[in-house]
Amino acid sequence: MKYKEIANNKEINAYLQKGNENLGQIGFTDHSKAHCVQVAHQAGKILKRMGYSEHEIELAKIAGYMHDIGNVINRTHHAEYGALLANDLLKETDMSLEDRITVIAAIGNHDESTGSPEDVISAALIIADKTDVRRSRVRQKEKSAYDIHDRVNYAVTDSKLKIAEDKSVIALNLQIDENICSMYDYFEIFLERMMLCRKSAEILGTTFKLTVNGRKVL
């Protein structure tokens, strides 16, 4: 089973689309196909850069693409719901049992409120997901109606995830407009997520660092 087959699967995409619509109704930022593709590609790039096998890269991309599928059921515990739903969907493919277990474990552990990185697949997924911070994820058109999540994402004017040549550091470098979002606001939303990225980097044998406006903050 290849990532491209998953990304073109009509049933999987229907669940993802409806989940994103559900989140829009309750005021969440964008979790559309663009986010799924971004997380999938970034998870794959992380493992490729760190020297993992093509097979592991494919599994990370599949987990990355499907990670938010549980939102179609409920936002609360969406990671766990997503793992169960993904298990049923992947049973209908030619994916081996071992690979299916790896993918659903990564999906089930990607949320900072309940999960933790268990292996390199889940670690890459977590870092890819939690570092997808960008202005285009804000759905609300009226700035006066922005909540803290909207402000934090809209404030990001540039976001780059880089891996050092010697693989010793995975660094998220952000530029934010502090007239829109204060550093306090950013950390209120993202501190727990960034700490999960740090744990994930350790699983990958490296270190996670965060800089905001050129200042090292983690």
Model-assigned labels for residue ranges:
Residues M1-H78:
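Acidic/His-rich, divalent-metal-binding segments that scaffold phosphate/diphosphate chemistry
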Residues S96-T157:
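Histidine/acidic-rich helix-loop-helix segments that form or flank divalent-metal centers
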Residues D132-L218:
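Terminal helices and disordered tails flanking the catalytic cores of nucleotide-processing hydrolases
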